């Protein structure tokens, strides 16, 4: 972890407009994934403020007020922390800041994605920076009522279903 933190600190200064907050919801202690994502985003020129593990809702809210981020990213690895991520997502809706999220629990239990009002970043960490860049560039909607990101398979099935309806 110390080496990863050193790499993050050595990343070049931000070259892109906007700010991203990244951390873990209350009770989530797993930090390797969020640290890796922080590193990947900083290497791509983003200003990322890493909040760390177990971020209380009141701290998240005050940090949002101060930093005015374009996107908040939260990571949950366990079922009970997916529930705390859901609570955090409701706060983000109230303050109208878009949420992106990911983590092992959403890969293992894909139906959970339907419950989280935000953008699922996908099952592979290395693909997340491109998804995040698209979300920031398009000004993602902070009032999403359910998980919206589709996998390639979902898109193909949806296209096939649409084609069947038209045919």
Language-model features: locations:
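Core of compact, soluble alpha-helical bundle domains
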Residues: 133-167
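Glycine-rich, charge-decorated loop segments at or immediately adjacent to ligand/cofactor-binding or catalytic sites
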Residues: 106-118
């Amino acid at each position: 972890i110390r080496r990863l933190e050193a790499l993050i600190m050595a990343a070049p200064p931000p070259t892109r407009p906007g700010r991203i907050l990244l951390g873990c919801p209350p009770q989530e202690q797993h930090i390797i994934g969020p640290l890796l994502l922080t590193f990947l985003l900083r290497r791509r020129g983003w200003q990322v403020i890493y909040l760390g593990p177990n971020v209380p809702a009141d701290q998240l809210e005050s940090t949002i007020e101060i930093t005015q981020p374009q996107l908040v990213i939260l990571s949950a690895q366990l079922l009970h922390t997916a529930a705390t991520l859901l609570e955090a997502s409701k706060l983000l809706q109230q303050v109208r800041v878009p949420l992106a999220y990911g983590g092992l629990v959403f890969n293992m239990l894909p139906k959970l994605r339907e419950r989280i009002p935000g953008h699922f970043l996908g099952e592979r960490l290395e693909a997340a920076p491109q998804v995040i860049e698209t979300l920031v560039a398009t000004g993602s909607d902070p009032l999403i009522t359910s998980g919206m990101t589709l996998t390639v398979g979902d898109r193909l099935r949806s296209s096939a279903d649409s084609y069947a309806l038209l045919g």
